[in-house]
């Protein structure tokens, strides 16, 4: 018994600790990448494209990574939107909230393995993204610098 415990402690435990530490640290690293609102906006644009590609190619497993990468970028834009005019901040904040909610629905549909529900949820993501694009966050945040 002690020999098996020693084998577990020396062979498997360090690997489990490393996996656990990396799984905790990855979202923090993504969040640190997107402190700049213009970089966050670029991340949102790219991840929406990645989600569209994943759903259209019926690769629902491909939804997970972009849906995790987009969240810190959404939070960054929400945080920076308070520096915009009240009306602009409200419109961008509303669009970001809808985008976040739509991404959650898409992630859930993909986790369920439902192509039909994923396509429906993707339309919601695209609608929220179009609403955000209409507010031209690139120009709004560019003027802040």
Where are these regions (language model features)?
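P-loop/Walker A NTP-binding region and its immediately flanking N-terminal helices
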Residues: 21
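Mature extracytoplasmic or organellar-lumen-exposed domains after removal of signal/transit peptides
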Residues: 32-145
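Bacterial N-terminal signal peptides that target proteins for export
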Residues: 2-17
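Sec/Tat signal peptide C-region and signal peptidase I cleavage site
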Residues: 25-31
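N-terminal amphipathic/basic-hydrophobic helices that include classical n-h-c signal peptides
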Residues: 1-3, 28, 144
